[in-house]
């Protein structure tokens, strides 16, 4: 005897999974990331090379004791195993590439970022592997620093739903804008010149 409740639950779960995955990998520009002039959201997250084991969520707290966001402000969480937006901003202009590591077009964007990074030593480049573990982030095979946003908190703060999303930040942490979808090397160069 089949149980309609079980079948309905399985169907609803499959539908929810499809909608979630489609949102992450969609080419549609429902969200465009941060816009020029938006405040730079602080974050601190483990690098893919960190020794953190188990669930290592990013810190997006702006003050002490903010529960799941973090027990201390994200800007104060620093170290050789941490990717920190405040630290990046203090060191000059930078580019953040948000990628969903299983999606090939996201992975493909990293090669162009590496090429452009070589030509612009005064601009820092970093990758955020969205909803990834350290192991998943390490599969990206890039020379750029890769942080992993295990629970998607940073992607949420940066309004990321499409992969790849690139956020360009000028000196002093001024957001210059974001792009959604893959960019050519020439398009990357144009954006990087705006912030350098």
Regions found by a protein language model. Name each.
Residues 57-108, 113:
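Short active-site neighborhood of thiol/selenol oxidoreductases, capturing the structured segment around
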Residues 41, 105, 111-112, 145, ...:
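Proline-centered helix-kink/hinge sites
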Residues 38-40, 90-93, 122, 163:
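Extracytoplasmic
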Residues 91-141, 150-156:
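Structural microenvironment flanking redox-active thiols in thiol-disulfide oxidoreductases
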Residues 52, 104, 134, 175, ...:
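Flexible, glycine-rich phosphate/dinucleotide-binding loops
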Residues 46, 109-112, 116-119, 182, ...:
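Structured segments of extracytoplasmic/periplasmic soluble domains
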Residues 1-70, 196:
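N-terminal targeting signals for export/organelle localization
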Residues 138-143, 148-196:
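Thiol/disulfide oxidoreductase modules built on the thioredoxin-like
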């Amino acid at each position: 005897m089949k149980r309609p409740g079980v079948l309905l639950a399985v169907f609803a779960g499959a539908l929810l999974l499809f909608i979630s995955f489609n949102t992450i990998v969609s080419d549609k520009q429902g969200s465009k990331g941060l816009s020029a002039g938006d405040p730079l959201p602080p974050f601190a997250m483990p690098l893919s090379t960190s020794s953190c084991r188990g669930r290592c969520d990013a810190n997006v707290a702006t003050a002490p004791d903010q529960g799941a966001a973090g027990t201390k402000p994200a800007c104060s969480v620093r170290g050789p195993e941490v990717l920190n937006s405040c630290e990046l901003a203090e060191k000059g202009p930078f580019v953040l590439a948000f990628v969903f590591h299983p999606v090939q077009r996201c992975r493909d964007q990293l090669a162009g970022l590496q090429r452009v990074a070589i030509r612009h030593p005064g601009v820092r480049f970093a990758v955020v592997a969205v909803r990834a573990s350290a192991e998943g982030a390490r599969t990206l095979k890039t020379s750029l620093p890769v942080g992993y946003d295990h629970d998607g908190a940073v992607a949420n703060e940066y309004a990321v739903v499409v992969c790849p999303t690139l956020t360009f930040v000028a000196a002093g942490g001024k957001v210059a804008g974001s792009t959604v979808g893959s960019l050519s090397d020439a398009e990357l160069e144009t954006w990087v010149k705006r912030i350098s």
